[in-house]
Regions:
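N-terminal leader/targeting and accessory segments in enzymes
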Residues: 1-109
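Nucleotide phosphate-binding/pyrophosphate-handling subdomain across enzymes
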Residues: 52, 189, 271
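Structural signal for conserved beta-strand scaffold positions within catalytic alpha/beta enzyme cores
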Residues: 61, 86, 99, 124, ...
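Short, polar loop motifs at secondary-structure junctions
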Residues: 84-91, 238-242, 257-258
Length: 276
């Protein structure tokens, strides 16, 4: 029972998501090859929220603990959705229904296939705190040289990250993805979808302990990012002893406040109170 609030919280975030697809024709081809079923329906957007459906959308029906998205198939059809991704076909709706074992898993597989078309740096950022601010800082720096694709809002979950990836287009030359976690295995799952080339773990702290149970489980969950970067680069915050102790399988680049780091910070407190 103690995990129910976490599941409900995660579901409430997922049900508020919608994107426009940059390449509907390309999406249809990738979807057809990945799901391996006939698919000739034009889809211009994807949503998990029945209230946000727009004409031409693919509606992803998610069955949660308290709300089952399958109960809204008639409504999304009336609002102009072209089709729905479901795990149970409803005879009460005339909308085109694509049956899969798990709609969230299916859209994750499609997103991975979509991501694999792009041979660009994909930087994953996770941590107990500071994910969004770090993402924005990295985005700001890289924008001087790259056309950056990045996570927006709370799109850092098992449904939000796939939707973020499906907004990648040929104009992008780098991607920055925020990854959130609330239980063991979440980051490994997101890495399997995103296939990152670089990774940053901001810190490891006792956040969302109700889902993890211990700080050690948090470290294991976040540390999956570095383990997944066999041929990539892990940026290690050496100032955090838990992050510094994580196993790195690829290239390791450390940063922090000590001279032993590969990139030590040189901070100075000025007389006016500013830090340079």
């Amino acid at each position: 029972m103690k995990n129910y609030p976490i599941l409900i919280w995660k579901l409430s975030k997922a049900l508020l998501m919608r994107i426009d697809l940059p390449d509907p024709v390309g999406f249809a081809e990738v979807f057809r090859k990945t799901i391996r079923i006939p698919f000739d329906t034009e889809v211009t957007g994807i949503t998990t929220d029945s209230r946000e459906v727009q004409s031409g959308d693919l509606y992803v029906a998610i069955a949660g603990e308290r709300v089952d998205g399958h109960t809204f198939l008639k409504e999304v059809n009336d609002q102009g959705a072209n089709c729905a991704l479901v795990n149970t076909v409803s005879k009460e709706s005339t909308i085109t229904q694509i049956k899969v074992d798990n709609p969230v898993t299916a859209i994750g597989k499609v997103a991975r296939a979509w991501r694999d078309q792009f041979h660009i740096p994909v930087i994953a950022i996770t941590g107990s705190n500071g994910k969004t601010s770090t993402k924005e800082l990295v985005k700001h720096v890289l924008s001087a040289q790259y056309n950056v694709h990045a996570t927006e809002g709370n799109y850092n979950t098992s449904i939000g990250l796939p939707l973020t990836l499906l907004q990648l287009s040929q104009v992008h030359t780098a991607s920055i993805l925020e990854m959130g976690a609330n239980q063991l295995g979440d980051i490994a799952e997101l890495c399997d979808i995103a296939n990152p080339t670089h990774g940053i773990i901001t810190n490891i702290a006792p956040a969302h302990l109700e889902g993890f149970g211990s700080i050690e489980t948090i470290a294991e969950t976040k540390g999956a990012l570095f383990k997944k970067l066999n041929n990539g680069v892990s940026f290690v915050n050496a100032a955090d002893h838990r992050v510094n102790a994580l196993e790195v399988t690829g290239e390791r680049i450390s940063f922090g406040l000590t001279p032993e780091c590969d990139f030590p910070a040189d901070l100075h407190h000025e007389d006016d109170g500013t830090i340079t």
